[in-house]
């Protein structure tokens, strides 16, 4: 059985425990505050385009030239829905990795680096092939070094699926999954209720804008036209008309059920830390796994507060991005011990 950790919001003694910023424990404030405190990338990324076997590409944003840092421990970041290096959690963690002497990299999902992808496909929660190919390319190109993968939100569900599918064959030493929607169908309905509809509208606008750019650059590479795209009003509708159809699923519900990581979590073989907040406004309670469903190598941490990929502590004058210490601290055992 997995190790289950619950965090008491009234205690704080190490990075393993989360205490929200005083007066700012509200889930929506926690979710939105990172965009105030982590507006800009504070390092100069080294960009690289990786051509994929099917003729498409993904863009990589490194903390430094990987050819000059191939000996360093590696931390790979998989972002959330319509995320990128510019997402506060992504560049914040890469910077934290850099400060520890590790090589950090964000693998942008297809079409998420600012340029539309070429092929008749996009990315989704269960699309593990690109991440798997990249991790193996990383090892072939730069040799063996301790490697960890971190997935946020959609990228977290994807990473959980990948870990479950490949078991010990996946070339990573450990993984961390944050705010992942392990039950996609339940979360899709949750996003259509109450204040969560604000987040749905925001994400849907990003999805539609990205799809419109793809249609303009590569006409016919999506199963709907621009007029149909403009009429989409819900993420579930977007997934029904585009995500499911372009990737061979019957509809959005079929996609959600086949790509939800929850039923696969018991197959994870690598050391993995999963972090959720009870008050995550993107999530339904069904994303919280039962202890008996998790294998011993999975540690599950459920905090009272934190919102969706928020977890802001400290004070307004001195904010603390808890994930930027919690994740590297937990991974140190697997990255630095192996690199000695």
Protein language model regions, located:
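Catalytic active-site module of serine/aspartate enzymes centered on a nucleophile-bearing elbow/loop
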Residues: 304-340
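Short beta-strand/loop motif that positions the catalytic acidic residue
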Residues: 268, 274-276, 280
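The serine-hydrolase catalytic nucleophile loop
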Residues: 83-95, 285-287
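Short beta-strand element of the alpha/beta-hydrolase
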Residues: 71-80
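Catalytic nucleophile-loop/oxyanion-hole region of alpha/beta-hydrolase
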Residues: 110-148
């Amino acid at each position: 059985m997995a190790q289950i950790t619950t965090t008491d919001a009234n205690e704080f003694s190490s990075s393993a425990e989360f205490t929200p910023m005083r007066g700012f424990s509200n889930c929506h404030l926690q979710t939105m505050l990172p965009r105030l405190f982590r507006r800009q990338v504070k390092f100069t990324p080294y960009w690289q385009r990786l051509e994929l076997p099917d003729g498409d590409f993904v863009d990589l944003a490194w903390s430094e030239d990987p050819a000059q840092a191939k000996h360093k421990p590696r931390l790979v970041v998989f972002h959330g829905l319509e995320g990128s290096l510019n997402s506060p959690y992504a560049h914040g963690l890469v910077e934290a990795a850099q400060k520890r002497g590790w090589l950090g990299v964000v693998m942008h999902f297809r079409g998420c680096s600012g340029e539309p992808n070429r092929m008749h496909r996009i990315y989704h929660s269960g699309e593990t092939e690109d991440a798997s190919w990249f991790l193996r390319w990383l090892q072939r190109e730069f040799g063996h070094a301790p490697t960890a993968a971190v997935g946020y939100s959609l990228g977290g569900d994807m990473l959980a699926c990948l870990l479950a599918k490949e078991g010990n064959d996946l070339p990573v030493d450990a993984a961390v999954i944050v705010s992942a929607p392990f039950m996609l169908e339940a979360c899709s309905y949750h996003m259509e209720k109450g204040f969560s509809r604000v987040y749905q509208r925001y994400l849907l606008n990003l999805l539609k804008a990205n799809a419109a750019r793809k249609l303009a650059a590569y006409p016919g590479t999506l199963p709907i036209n621009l007029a149909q795209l403009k009429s989409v009003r819900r993420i579930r509708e977007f997934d029904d008309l585009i995500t499911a159809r372009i990737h061979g699923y019957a509809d959005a519900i079929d996609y959600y059920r086949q790509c939800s990581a929850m039923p696969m979590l018991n197959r994870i073989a690598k050391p993995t830390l999963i972090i959720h907040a009870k008050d995550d406004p993107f999530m339904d309670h069904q994303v919280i796994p039962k202890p008996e469903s998790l294998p011993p190598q999975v540690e599950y941490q459920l905090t009272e507060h934190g919102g969706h990929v928020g977890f802001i502590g400290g004070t307004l004058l001195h904010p603390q991005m808890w994930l930027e210490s919690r994740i590297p601290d937990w991974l140190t055992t697997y990255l630095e011990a192996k690199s000695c």
